[in-house]
């Protein structure tokens, strides 16, 4: 069964270190681990890497469409390779989870995440897997009583201490990926969620 792991982010050097690109960081780390490279694929509106996982095809995708149009890329690749929504894992940044924590779930709402909204529209279902990497909320981090604009926050690089925590959650996500891809999603969730 062909699987797809999508990292969400914004293309371009100016966004490489933004919190909003945590999904890209995850699939970049996975590609390195698997020894594969991303290649630009215009027909899929993104960069694609193809690997084998226990004899099955595994695609990694970084949409080049900007976050809010990610569904265009995901939909094109899924239609071409006949990948079902339940075989998709979308890796995203999550404001409502503290840095260092990650959560795995199937389906659910978009939580205001425009990338997820667009993917859901293109797949015509919310029933795909999400790996939510905590980046924290600006109200928790500002500390000076003044609210920080969410859009401004996600488009900035994290502080060094936050980055280390996000990197830990990426490692934790990579560590449960084997369980997830084998279909042992309950154990994968328990292991990941026990990390914090």
From Swiss-Prot:
SUPFAM superfamilies: Peptidyl-tRNA hydrolase-like (SSF53178). Its EC number is 3.1.1.29. One of its GO terms (cellular component) is cytoplasm. GO terms for biological process: protein quality control for misfolded or incompletely synthesized proteins; rescue of stalled ribosome. It is found in: Cytoplasm. InterPro entries: Pept_tRNA_hydro, Pept_tRNA_hydro_CS, Pept_tRNA_hydro_sf. It holds the Pfam family Pept_tRNA_hydro. The active site is at residue 20. The record marks 93 as: Stabilizes the basic form of H active site to accept a proton. GO terms for molecular function: peptidyl-tRNA hydrolase activity; tRNA binding. Its main location: cytoplasm. Keywords: Cytoplasm, Hydrolase, RNA-binding, tRNA-binding. Signal peptide: none annotated. The keyword ATP-binding does not apply. It catalyses: an N-acyl-L-alpha-aminoacyl-tRNA + H2O = an N-acyl-L-amino acid + a tRNA + H(+). TRNA binds at residues 15, 66, 68, 114. HAMAP family: Pept_tRNA_hydro_bact. Belongs to the PTH family. This is Peptidyl-tRNA hydrolase. The gene is pth.
């Amino acid at each position: 069964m062909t699987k797809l792991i999508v990292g969400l982010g914004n293309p371009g050097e100016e966004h490489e270190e933004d919190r909003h690109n945590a999904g890209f960081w995850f699939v970049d780390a996975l590609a390195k681990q698997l020894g594969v490279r991303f290649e630009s694929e215009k027909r899929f509106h993104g960069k694609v890497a193809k690997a084998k996982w226990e004899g099955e095809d595994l695609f990694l995708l970084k949409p080049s469409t900007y976050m809010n149009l990610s569904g265009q890329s995901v939909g094109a690749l899924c239609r071409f390779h006949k990948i079902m929504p339940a075989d998709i894992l979308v890796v995203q940044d999550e404001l409502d989870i503290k840095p260092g924590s990650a959560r795995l779930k199937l389906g659910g709402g978009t939580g205001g995440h425009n990338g997820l909204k667009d993917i859901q529209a293109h797949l015509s279902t919310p029933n795909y897997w999400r790996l939510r990497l905590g980046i924290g909320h600006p109200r928790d981090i500002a500390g000076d009583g003044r609210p920080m604009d969410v859009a401004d926050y996600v488009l900035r690089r994290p502080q060094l201490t936050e980055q280390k925590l996000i990197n830990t959650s990426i490692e934790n996500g990579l560590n449960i990926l084997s369980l997830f891809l084998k279909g042992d999603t309950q154990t994968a969730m328990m292991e990941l969620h026990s990390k914090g």
